[in-house]
Amino acid sequence: MRLVILIASLLVLTEPSNSSALDQPGSSCDDLGALAADPLRQSEPVRFEDIQAKRLISACRTDIESATKAQDQARYYLQLGRGQLRDDDTGGAMASFNKSASFAYPAGYFAFGVAYLLGDDVGKDDTKAKVYLLLALKGNVVWAAKALSALHQNRASEFYDAKLAQNYLTLFQDSQF
């Protein structure tokens, strides 16, 4: 459950959005589930609480099957994972986030890195979390800096470093890459 809450907070509270899935005119995976933290998103972001899980899951599965570009498939898998998470299918969400990350998709790395950071539905692994979050940050996923700050703030982590935690937090707050 902690995984759902933190992933939801990191995948939801990214930036304010005036859009909601109910306002979206389209029925595509992008229109129904775009993540604000995704620098490669193709539509206005949809807040997590506004996701219509069943519609999003169906649209993403359809779009995955018809996608011809790997980047599009990766984005659709990320958004499919959001729908599955909204539908309380954490196992399905993890598989979708993993698939997105397997395409080297920056926001997919972010989602998977957060999962390893928390360690609820996958074994907690700070090393893997750091690797995935750094890959996400390299791909300009601003929210990865905040997750890295949390990792380095944790006194129980082998990566505890208060100064580095503050640097990542400042990077996140400044949103300068």
Q: Residue ranges of each PLM-predicted region?
A:
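TPR/TPR-like alpha-solenoid signature
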Residues: G26, D30-G33, L78, F110, ...
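Short coil/turn and helix-start
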Residues: D50-K54, T68-A70, R86-G91, S102, ...
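Hydrophobic face of amphipathic alpha-helices that form TPR/SEL1-like repeat modules
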Residues: L78-Q84, A111-L118, A147-R155
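Terminal, low-structured helical/coil segments at or just beyond the last alpha-helical repeat
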Residues: P25, S149-F177
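N-terminal leader/linker segments that initiate helical-solenoid repeat arrays
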Residues: S17-I64
